Structure formats: structure tokens, C-alpha cells
């Protein structure tokens, strides 16, 4: 009771990152391929509809040791998709819409900027890959749900969007090292993406 009080600084655990080694995702039924790290696993994404047939080319790249996932969604430019539309009573109904390139780009920006309440900055940078694919990479700063997002397209046939999420309460300081580490993997995925 008579000892001097010593304040304890807030700290975070040291994270030992694995060596960067990549393997190829090249499912013959998919319209794209890319390289991803061996410390991740691929799973089919049915989280939005509980029915993978509505979006059969959407996948998750899961990083179990980091409690993170890159959600990848794919759509055909000019094709149609089923969207959930909110009714006035709060329930949802299915609606079919055309996948125009402009609409998908606007949707990507809108999804990114939904984080502007928590973000204190949002940076976007235009990308051009070695395989003549263009897109935009978003870096968000602040306690946001997803600090890294991107979309890629050839503007005529293919459109792919990715967003990194963690199964944790957003805390920019504690997630910074893992966000930086997985950003390298996202950039590798982007630079190795090929359309089929």
C-alpha cells in the first residue's frame, strides 16, 4: 500500500509473421486465377445469400492465424445479378439488375466510403497490372471495419472486388502490423490476377 504507483503502458502482442510463399488459385470453373499465400486457405463465399449459385465465383481468402479474411466478389460486366433490395417495412426482396461497369465502380466507391464515419482518411490509387488489368486500391485510416479494399476490371467482361476484414473490434493501432503484412499479399494477388 505504501509503494509508488507505476503506470502501465498499453501494448500489443508481438506477431511473428510467416515467410512469404505463394501458391496458385486456378480452379478450371472460375473466370480468373491468381497467387495467394500458403498460410491462407480458399473457401467458397455464400455469406451474402446462403446460396453460392447466385454468385458462384465469389470466394474468401481466409487467414486463420490472423483472424482475417479477404472477401472476393466477381461479376460479369454486362451480365445480371440478383440484389437484395430493402422494402419500406425493413424486409428484403430480390431484384435483378444489370452489371454495368459504371454501376459496379460506383458501388465499389460507395462501399468504401460507408466507412467514412470512422475513417479519418481514405486514399485511393489507380493500378495497372502486368497483365493489363486496371483498378483502384483503397487504404483507409482509422478504426474502420476494412482498411484495405480494391477492385479490378478489364472494363468489358470482368469485374472483381476485394476487401480485407478481421474478426475483431477495429483498432487501427493493434491491427496496423497485420494490415501492412496482408497488404503485401493483396498487392501480390492483384499483380498476379489473370482473366480466363
PLM regions: where:
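Short, ordered beta-strand-loop transition motifs
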Residues: 26, 45-55, 126-134
Amino acid at each position: 500500500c505504501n509503494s509508488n504507483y507505476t503506470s502501465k503502458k498499453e501494448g500489443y502482442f508481438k506477431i511473428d509473421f510467416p515467410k512469404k510463399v505463394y501458391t496458385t488459385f486456378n480452379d478450371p470453373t472460375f473466370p480468373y486465377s491468381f497467387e495467394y499465400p500458403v498460410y491462407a486457405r480458399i473457401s467458397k463465399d455464400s455469406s451474402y445469400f446462403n446460396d453460392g449459385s447466385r454468385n458462384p465465383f465469389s470466394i474468401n481468402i481466409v487467414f486463420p492465424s490472423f483472424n482475417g479474411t479477404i472477401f472476393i466478389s466477381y461479376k460479369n460486366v454486362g451480365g445480371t445479378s440478383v440484389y437484395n433490395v430493402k422494402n419500406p417495412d425493413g424486409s428484403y426482396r430480390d431484384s435483378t439488375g444489370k452489371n454495368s461497369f459504371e454501376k459496379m465502380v460506383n458501388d465499389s466507391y460507395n462501399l468504401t466510403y460507408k466507412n467514412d464515419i470512422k475513417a479519418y482518411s481514405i486514399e485511393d490509387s489507380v493500378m495497372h497490372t502486368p497483365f493489363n488489368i486496371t483498378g483502384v486500391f483503397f487504404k483507409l485510416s482509422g478504426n474502420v471495419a476494412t482498411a484495405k479494399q480494391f477492385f479490378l476490371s478489364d472494363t468489358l467482361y470482368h469485374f472483381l472486388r476485394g476487401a480485407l476484414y478481421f474478426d475483431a473490434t477495429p483498432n487501427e493501432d493493434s491491427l496496423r502490423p497485420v494490415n501492412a503484412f496482408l497488404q503485401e499479399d493483396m498487392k501480390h494477388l492483384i499483380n498476379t490476377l489473370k482473366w480466363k
